[in-house]
Amino acid sequence: MAEAVGAVTLIAAPARRRWLWSALAAMLGLLTARISALEVHTPKEIFVVNGTQGKLTCTFDSPNTTGWLTTVSWSFQPEGTDSAVSFFHYSQGQVYIGDYPPFKDRVTWAGDLDKKDASINIENIQAVHNGTYICDVKNPPDIVVRPGQIRLHVVEIDNLLVFLVWVVVGTVTAVVLGLTLLISLVLVVLYRRKHSKRDYTGCSTSERLSPVKQAPRKCPSDTEGLVKSPPSAGSHQGPVIYAQLDHSGGHHSGKINKSESVVYADIRKD
């Protein structure tokens, strides 16, 4: 009998050693594996009506496939406190709920690790559930994680309706003001363009293309007297003699002489 027990012990010893070596190799592989960052995504805040169900949405991104080693933990930090209490844990397909009274028989799993979803539902939310919820996911070798945080506000139905009305009114007002401003700017631009075209009177095409020739003007000399004949034979006015006045300022000036015709003598017949 003793020999049989000794044989069983000798047979079990190698098997135990192999199991230990396998476990050590697995742990060593986890320690030496590449550690990559896992990103957790949650909404910043949600509003839930008192007495209804609230869903705490939590998703994550990981380059590694989820499996039995993937875990999800939820913690709660009540308003006015600095410490968080863990009240939910999910691992290997099992849900573990703590004894924290505000969440007893209220929390259910609503996620799917294959879809990288770690969400939960809370039934019959009350004012005591106001606070910050923390979603922490581990997916080895992704263990460097910044947990996601959700600020939950429990509101009464009347307050929620008032809040929604103000949101709608504010949105509609902003849209109306924006459209009014845009239409006003368009009308101002069109008005300015229309009046700028009306005020500008340019020459026609024919005027721009047709050259205008002016007859050369004869400038009398300084010593030349011009005699203008009377306009008609029946007039009693005699010939008018014009003289040129030189305004050049000197006979040797290099400037162009400017002359002016004045009446020198008016001979009339009585």
UniProtKB/Swiss-Prot annotation:
Which Pfam families does this one have? V-set
Listed InterPro entries: Ig-like_dom, Ig-like_dom_sf, Ig-like_fold, Ig_sub, Ig_V-set, Myelin_P0-rel
According to its record, what are the GO cellular component terms?
plasma membrane
In the record, Phosphoserine modifications are located at: S204, S206, S210, S221, S261
- Residues on the membrane's Cytoplasmic side span 184-270
Question: Does the UniProt entry include the keyword Iron?
Answer: no
Motif ITIM motif 1 is found at 240-245
Mark the residues carrying the PTM Phosphotyrosine: Y242, Y264
* UniProt motif (ITIM motif 2) ranges: 262-267
Residue positions with a glycan? N50, N130
Q: List the disulfide bonds.
A: C58-C135
The UniProt keyword set, sorted, is:
Disulfide bond, Glycoprotein, Immunoglobulin domain, Membrane, Phosphoprotein, Signal, Transmembrane, Transmembrane helix
Q: Which residues form the Ig-like V-type domain?
A: 36-151
Chain ranges passing through the membrane: 163-183
Q: How does it sit in the membrane?
A: Single-pass type I membrane protein
Residues of the signal peptide: 1-35
Q: Posttranslational modification, per the record?
A: Phosphorylated on tyrosine residues upon stimulation with pervanadate and concanavalin-A (ConA). Phosphorylation at Tyr-242 and Tyr-264 is required for interaction with PTPN11/SHP-2. Dephosphorylated by PTPN11/SHP-2 (in vitro). N-glycosylated.
Ranges of the Extracellular topological domain = 36-162
Q: Does the keyword Signal apply?
A: yes
Provide the family line.
Belongs to the myelin P0 protein family.
Q: Which purpose does this protein serve, as stated in its record?
A: Cell surface receptor, which is involved in signal transduction processes. Recruits PTPN11/SHP-2 to the cell membrane and is a putative substrate of PTPN11/SHP-2. Is a major receptor for concanavalin-A (ConA) and is involved in cellular signaling induced by ConA, which probably includes Src family tyrosine-protein kinases. May be involved in regulation of integrin-mediated cell motility.
- Note on domains (UniProt): Contains 2 copies of a cytoplasmic motif that is referred to as the immunoreceptor tyrosine-based inhibitor motif (ITIM). This motif is involved in modulation of cellular responses. The phosphorylated ITIM motif can bind the SH2 domain of several SH2-containing phosphatases.
The annotated subunit structure for this chain is: Interacts with phosphorylated PTPN11/SHP-2.
Name by which UniProt lists this protein: Myelin protein zero-like protein 1
Lineage, please? Eukaryota, Metazoa, Chordata, Craniata, Vertebrata
Q: Which gene encodes it?
A: Mpzl1
